Structure formats: structure tokens, C-alpha cells
């Protein structure tokens, strides 16, 4: 069914655009803009009827639309092109009109430094006239700017690296019938044709109403060498538009372009979309609104006052039920947390961890905490949730982020932990703005997290499976000690028993291959820790798609380096020469051992601690040992992903913003039913 719909759509929209390329020329035509061959930014948008709208009905806007791929103007022959487009500039009722529209040729489509208003969305005050701009444009301008030597508010101009046109003229076209130039109002809201032809170092610009033929005499004709403007011949072509205090709707209806002397593909006016006409408000409606406004305002004021009263009354309200009495010593008041975070103000926002937002809070006696706000529902699930929060508070280890307690409101749970001033480890590994961690600092962090996992698996009152070990869940305290946090996926079970998990969770790249079929165990935590070891030593994420294929999967790449007797080639290049080769090799080999796809071949965390401390040598294995260096990513259909509160998932707040939230390349935790 979906394939049939796609074919119907493809056939019905094929008439909108046609591309033609050869080794000698490139041409295309848009009869309406119903395809995705354009790169849009700013306020530019495609309307359902095929219109390309460059500027919206707001002040100080700019929009750009360019062909996605640059056009290769052959360097073996003089630069040449012809283009024909139809546009309409429709002033917003009550305004005189915006700052017009430009046809642009540029080596880049990055106009983030450009300004709206008189700079047309392609120039700015600091780059005017700079040859480094490499910019050519034909402007249809409807605002007079005396600073730019413009004589009226209805003109056509040729711009080269500068909004001050090298040549301009009032908008008009040569009428064959009248044998003279006839004025044309660019802001009439009616479709206008524009032709720009450049051949033999002569640039011709013509305009005409939609119903007229191409004028036999151009409006502007200038001898110029465009090849001197552009340092390269791969150039983008497209359009820009801008508004200032005056506002217009800027529309493009169709566009034809060719690098040949003649347009090989002509516009079909019968296929062009219609230009909408903005409606002015009726005077009676305006009068009625003026009469009703005081009444409406009074009602709004009363509603606001009532809302403020209700809000203040409920501001510090909490939810407390009889079953929570036994947890009273672990509970914070909502008022204290509200004041500590300044009302959860955006200035106190640290980031988003698993299942909630994290804020910094300053409690009395100079106690700084991190407060995570987690949504919840269901009384039974909440009982289990709070019970596990309190159980987690009983865990005491120098390399765990300490959980201090909780607070509960209707539909919301607040978790309080110690604040970690140096943020998350992944920020220091992957953010170029953060200081580079030395090898000695990294090695101490690795040994600390290994010790914390050994404690969770062996020494705690119950076995704790973390299930989401990665650099973004390791926080750094004031002394840069590693603290394992964000226990949003954690599970508890008695020693000697098995975890009764009903869902496989984790982050892609860190999940053991057997997780879906066999469920979580301490040995799946070991696998994730192995990936974490490689992540820290190599300064790379477990899966990266923007690199060479052989380096895409970290586990496989490290193993391949070992096979070539060049294991140290995989280390983080930011370490420079300040590292201990034996320690780096130990960490990488241990990472490969922990990520063995044969679960029984992985070491326990007690052995890992001994390996890292040097009290136990690594077992005899090589990069060719069965299960070493194999990466089998856990893949799941998106439809089966769930995040279940009632399955007792909870998240202790990380004490600073995690770069998992700030990096688009970093995978988010996944949970799906096994």
C-alpha cells in the first residue's frame, strides 16, 4: 500500500521539476516547488500549493533557498548562464513592503552572519564591499536606502560583493506595442517575470508582467567579468529575501536555469501555483474589537489574579501518603528544593539525564545539590520507585554519585544527589572546549569506576545491575575523581539469585549481544564497562558514522590495530606523548577481553579490579582469540521501544549536564520488551 502511494505521489509531482546535466551544461526547471531539491533556511518554507515563501509576515526576518548541490561551471570555458523566474512581492496590509528579493550566486550557502533589512539577508555591515565575499546578486528592492545611493523604492540592481549596486534602474520593461519603457510596480502583489542572462562578459537583466513576453531590450546591460568575482567554479544558485520594519510576503512561483546560452527547459505558466492575497481586517471587526477589548482585558486580569492566588496556594503543595512514613528521614520538602533552585529557573538548568531535567540547587549551610524532576504515574509503581530510591541511598562508595533523598508532588518525583562541579566525563573526552584529561587522570577514573562496579555486583547488600555504563553517566567531582551516576536503568536482586528483568535496556554500542535473549546480568555490565574502557583510552564513541568504514566500530578497529602490532595507534591523539604505553595497552586489551561476545569468557569485576591495579596479569589471549574484536550491535525495531515507569526504572540525577544531551551523535538510552 505504501509503495503504491509513493508511486502515485511521484507521478503526480514529477511535472514540478526537471533536471538535466551533461559534461558541458546544467539546466533545471521548477514549475512550482513541490520537491526537496532546495536547501532552505531562515524563514524560507514550502507551502502546500507549491509556492516557495522566502520571508514570513514578521519584522526583521530573512530566508534563503538554494539548490542543494553546487553547480560546476566549467573552468575550461567562460562563465555563462541564463535564468528565468517568476516572483511576487505582496505587502502585508498596513505596511509599505519589505526589503525585496535577490537572485544570488555564491560559493557558499552559509549566510548565518548576514543581516536582514537593507542588507537583503546576504550582506552585513562589516563585509560590505569586501572582495572576499565572492557574491553576485540581482536585487528587486522595494525600500529606498539613501546610504546605498538608491534613488527610489522600486528598482532593480546588480550587486557585486556589496549592497551598493554597480548599476540600477527603476523597475520597468520595454513594451513592443508602446515602443517605450513601461513602469512596473514590484510591490503590486502580482507575478513578475525576471530574466538574468550572462554570456560573453555581458550581463543583461529584464523584467516584465506575467502576461508579457520577454522584452527585446533589457532593463540593465553591463559589461563585467564575473569570473574575477569567484575564486572557484563550483557555485550555488538560489534566492534570498529579507524584511525590516516594513513587511512583505516574498513568493517564488517558478524557476528555470541553464549554464547554456539558451534555456533548454522553459517555465510552464499553466503549472505555476496561485499567489494568495492577504485580507485586510474589516473596519467593523476592528471597531467591535476596540469596544470589546476593555471587557476582554478585565476578564483576563481577573483570571490572572485568580490564577496567581491559586498558584501561590498550591506552590509548595506536596503529595504524602501513609505508606511513605517509613521513608520520612529521606524526604526533602518541596519548598526547600524550590527555593534552592530559584524556582527551577533556567539559569540553574544543568541538562537532561534519563527521564528528567536536572537543576543545580543551593541548600542552607553551603550545601550544593543536583535536583532531577521525573514524571510518574501509578501508586503501586511509585511505591516500588521510592523503595528503590531509598535502597539506592544506602549504597556507600567513594566512586558513586551519592543520592541524598527525594520529594514527591502530584505527577512528579524529585531526586536529590550531590553536585559534581566538573560535569560528565564525556564532556572532557569529546568536547573541544573542555580541558583534555591526562592519561594518569583517565587511568585513576577507570580504576575508580571498576571499583564502584565491583562494589555494586559483590559488596552491596543486594546485587545492583547498573545497565547503562558509559562516559556520559560518569561524573567528575572537584578532584576529577570518577563517580558512577544516573541509575535510571538499575535493577536490584539478592545475591545468588537472578535479576527478574522483563525488559532489555541500555545504550546502542554498549549493550551486550546476549542482552535480548538472556536478559541483564553482572556480565552484561562487564561488557558495557569494556566499551567504556576503550572509549576513555581512544577518545572515541563506540559507534561513529562520520569516519572511515574501518574505524566506524570502536571494538573492531582496536582489534585490527592489535593485529597489525600497532595497538597504540588507537589511543586518543589528544594524549600526545604524555602516557604510559604499558597502561594504555593494558586498558585496551582489557576492553577487548570484557567485550568478548562469548559471555563466559568475560572476567568478573573483581578480576577487572585486579588487572587494572597490576595485582593480576591478563590471561593469555590474542586478537585472533574466539569472540575477541567482534561487534554485534543490538538493533531493535523502533515500534517496540518503551520507557516504563511501572517496571521500576528510575534515574538518580547526574550532578551536571551530560553531553549526551548536548551531542547529537551520542546515543540515548533505549528500553524495549524482550
Swiss-Prot record:
In the C-terminal section; belongs to the protein kinase superfamily. Ser/Thr protein kinase family. In the N-terminal section; belongs to the leguminous lectin family. Its EC number is 2.7.11.1. Residues 1-22 form the signal peptide. Residues 649-662 have a biased composition (Low complexity). It is found in: Cell membrane. It comes from Arabidopsis thaliana (Mouse-ear cress). ATP binds at residues 350-358, 372. This is Probable L-type lectin-domain containing receptor kinase I.5. It is an enzyme of class 2 (transferase). Keywords: ATP-binding, Cell membrane, Glycoprotein, Kinase, Lectin, Membrane, Nucleotide-binding, Receptor, Serine/threonine-protein kinase, Signal, Transferase, Transmembrane, Transmembrane helix. It catalyses: L-seryl-[protein] + ATP = O-phospho-L-seryl-[protein] + ADP + H(+); L-threonyl-[protein] + ATP = O-phospho-L-threonyl-[protein] + ADP + H(+). The keyword Thylakoid does not apply. PANTHER family: PTHR27007. One of its GO terms (biological process) is pathogen-associated molecular pattern receptor signaling pathway. Residues 23-286 are extracellular. Residues 25-258 are annotated as: Legume-lectin like. Residues 308-674 are cytoplasmic. The chain crosses the membrane at residues 287-307. Glycans are attached at residues 124, 181, 185, 204, 225. Residues 649-674 are annotated as: Disordered. CDD domains: lectin_legume_LecRK_Arcelin_ConA (cd06899), STKc_IRAK (cd14066). The active site is at 468 (proton acceptor). Residues 663-674 have a biased composition (Basic and acidic residues).
Amino acid at each position: 500500500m505504501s509503495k503504491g502511494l509513493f508511486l502515485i505521489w511521484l507521478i503526480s509531482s514529477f511535472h514540478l521539476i526537471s533536471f538535466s546535466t551533461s559534461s558541458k551544461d546544467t539546466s533545471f526547471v521548477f514549475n512550482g516547488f513541490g520537491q526537496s531539491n532546495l536547501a532552505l533556511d531562515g524563514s524560507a518554507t514550502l507551502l502546500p500549493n507549491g509556492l516557495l515563501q522566502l520571508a514570513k509576515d514578521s519584522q526583521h526576518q530573512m530566508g534563503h533557498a538554494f539548490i542543494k548541490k553546487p553547480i560546476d561551471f566549467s573552468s575550461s570555458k567562460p562563465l555563462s548562464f541564463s535564468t528565468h523566474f517568476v516572483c511576487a512581492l505582496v505587502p502585508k496590509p498596513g505596511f509599505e513592503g519589505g526589503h525585496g528579493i535577490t537572485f544570488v550566486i555564491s560559493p557558499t550557502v552559509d549566510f548565518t552572519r548576514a543581516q536582514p533589512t537593507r542588507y537583503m539577508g546576504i550582506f552585513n555591515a562589516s563585509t560590505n564591499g569586501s572582495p572576499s565575499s565572492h557574491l553576485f546578486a540581482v536585487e528587486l528592492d522595494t525600500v529606498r536606502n539613501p546610504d546605498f545611493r538608491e534613488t527610489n523604492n522600486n528598482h532593480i540592481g546588480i550587486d557585486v560583493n556589496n549592497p551598493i549596486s554597480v548599476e540600477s534602474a527603476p523597475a520597468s520593461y520595454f513594451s513592443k506595442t508602446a515602443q517605450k519603457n513601461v513602469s512596473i510596480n514590484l510591490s503590486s502583489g502580482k507575478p513578475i517575470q525576471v530574466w538574468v542572462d550572462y554570456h560573453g562578459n555581458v550581463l543583461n537583466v529584464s523584467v516584465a508582467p506575467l502576461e508579457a513576453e520577454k522584452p527585446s531590450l533589457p532593463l540593465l546591460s553591463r559589461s563585467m567579468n564575473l569570473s574575477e568575482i569567484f575564486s572557484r567554479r563550483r557555485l550555488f544558485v538560489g534566492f534570498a529575501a529579507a524584511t525590516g520594519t516594513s513587511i512583505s510576503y516574498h513568493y517564488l512561483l517558478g524557476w528555470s536555469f541553464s549554464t547554456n546560452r539558451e534555456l533548454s527547459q522553459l517555465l510552464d505558466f499553466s503549472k505555476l501555483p496561485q499567489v494568495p492575497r492577504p485580507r485586510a481586517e474589516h473596519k467593523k471587526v476592528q471597531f467591535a474589537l476596540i469596544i470589546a477589548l476593555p471587557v476582554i482585558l478585565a476578564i483576563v486580569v481577573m483570571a490572572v489574579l485568580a490564577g496567581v492566588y491559586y498558584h501561590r496556594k498550591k506552590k509548595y503543595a506536596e503529595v504524602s501518603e501513609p505508606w511513605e512514613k517509613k521513608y520520612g528521614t529521606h524526604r526533602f520538602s518541596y519548598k526547600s528544593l524550590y527555593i534552592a533552585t530559584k524556582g527551577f529557573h533556567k539559569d540553574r538548568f544543568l541538562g537532561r539525564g534519563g527521564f528528567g531535567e536536572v537543576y543545580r540547587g543551593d541548600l542552607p549551610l553551603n550545601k550544593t545539590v543536583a535536583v532531577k524532576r521525573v514524571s510518574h504515574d501509578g501508586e503501586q509503581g511509585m511505591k516500588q520507585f521510592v523503595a528503590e530510591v531509598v535502597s539506592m541511598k544506602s549504597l556507600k562508595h567513594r566512586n558513586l554519585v551519592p543520592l541524598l533523598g527525594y520529594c514527591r508532588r502530584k505527577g512528579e518525583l524529585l531526586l536529590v544527589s550531590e553536585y559534581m562541579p566538573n560535569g560528565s566525563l564525556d564532556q572532557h573526552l569529546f568536547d573541544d572546549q573542555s580541558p583534555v584529561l591526562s592519561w594518569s587522570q583517565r587511568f585513576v577514573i577507570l580504576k575508580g569506576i571498576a571499583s564502584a562496579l565491583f562494589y555494586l555486583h559483590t559488596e552491596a547488600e543486594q546485587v545492583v545491575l547498573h545497565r547503562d555504563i558509559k562516559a556520559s553517566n560518569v561524573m567528575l567531582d572537584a578532584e576529577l575523581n570518577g563517580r558512577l551516576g544516573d541509575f535510571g536503568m538499575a535493577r536490584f536482586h539478592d545475591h545468588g539469585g537472578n535479576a527478574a528483568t522483563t525488559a532489555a535496556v541500555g545504550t546502542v554500542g554498549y549493550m551486550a549481544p546476549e542482552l535480548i535473549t538472556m536478559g541483564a546480568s553482572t556480565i552484561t555490565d562487564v561488557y558495557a564497562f569494556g566499551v567504556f574502557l576503550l572509549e576513555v583510552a581512544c577518545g572515541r564513541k563506540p559507534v561513529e558514522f562520520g569516519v572511515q568504514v574501518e574505524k566506524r566500530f570502536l571494538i573492531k578497529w582496536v582489534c585490527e590495530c592489535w593485529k597489525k602490532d600497532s595497538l597504540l595507534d588507537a589511543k586518543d591523539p589528544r594524549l600526545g606523548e604524555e602516557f604510559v604505553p604499558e597502561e594504555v595497552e593494558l586498558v585496551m586489551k582489557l576492553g577487548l577481553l570484557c567485550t568478548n561476545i562469548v559471555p563466559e569468557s568475560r572476567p568478573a569485576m573483581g578480576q577487572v579490579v585486579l588487572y587494572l591495579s597490576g595485582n593480576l596479569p591478563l590471561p593469555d589471549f590474542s586478537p585472533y582469540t574466539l569472540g575477541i574484536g567482534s561487534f554485534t550491535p543490538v538493533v531493535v525495531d523502533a515500534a517496540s521501544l518503551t520507557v516504563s515507569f511501572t517496571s521500576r526504572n528510575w534515574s538518580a540525577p547526574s550532578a551536571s549536564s551530560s553531553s549526551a544531551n548536548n551531542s547529537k551523535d551520542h546515543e540515548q538510552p533505549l528500553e524495549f520488551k524482550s
